[in-house]
């Protein structure tokens, strides 16, 4: 189990360091105004930092101290697990989809003039991604179906197995 915890620590710390560096580089870029792709790259670092930080500074210490699910403070576990599994995990792929659409438009329509130049489409898409990524948290609040971190098996699981089964069957 030590090898698994050390590998989780190494990967997550490396992820925090690289993504914080990228965030700082993107945020302090002298090129203004930021392009759409630049904004998306900057924003993509946020869920990456969140995920890696929760693993580095929450999951790894709990696992190192060999805590069990019963000994971990429940509210803290619920909040951090919901941030991780309910917002940060879905947000990453949503931003990647926006990045892919952006690159598709730039590659295949390089000289096309966007009709909606005055509307900040990238900002709206980022906001939409945040709203979509928040849906699992909203659903879990209404269904009392939460994720929790179980340090004894190093994984985030649904707190009640039957609530997940009910969600899948509906």
What is each of the regions a protein language model found here?
Residues 1-170:
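Seven-transmembrane-like multi-pass membrane architecture, highlighting hydrophobic TM helices
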């Amino acid at each position: 189990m030590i090898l698994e915890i050390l590998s989780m620590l190494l990967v997550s710390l490396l992820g925090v360091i690289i993504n914080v560096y990228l965030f700082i580089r993107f945020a302090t870029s002298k090129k203004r105004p930021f392009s759409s792709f630049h904004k998306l790259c900057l924003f993509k670092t946020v869920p990456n930092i969140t995920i890696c930080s929760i693993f580095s500074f929450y999951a790894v210490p709990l696992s190192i101290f060999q805590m069990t699910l019963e000994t971990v403070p429940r509210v803290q576990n619920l909040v951090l697990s919901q941030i991780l599994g309910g917002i940060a995990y879905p947000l990453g792929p949503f931003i990647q989809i926006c990045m892919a659409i952006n690159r598709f438009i730039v590659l295949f329509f390089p000289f096309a003039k966007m009709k909606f130049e005055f509307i900040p489409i990238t900002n709206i898409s980022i906001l939409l991604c945040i709203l979509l990524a928040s849906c699992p948290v909203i659903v879990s609040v209404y269904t009392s179906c939460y994720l929790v971190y179980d340090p004894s098996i190093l994984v985030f699981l649904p707190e009640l197995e039957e609530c997940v089964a009910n969600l899948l069957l509906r």
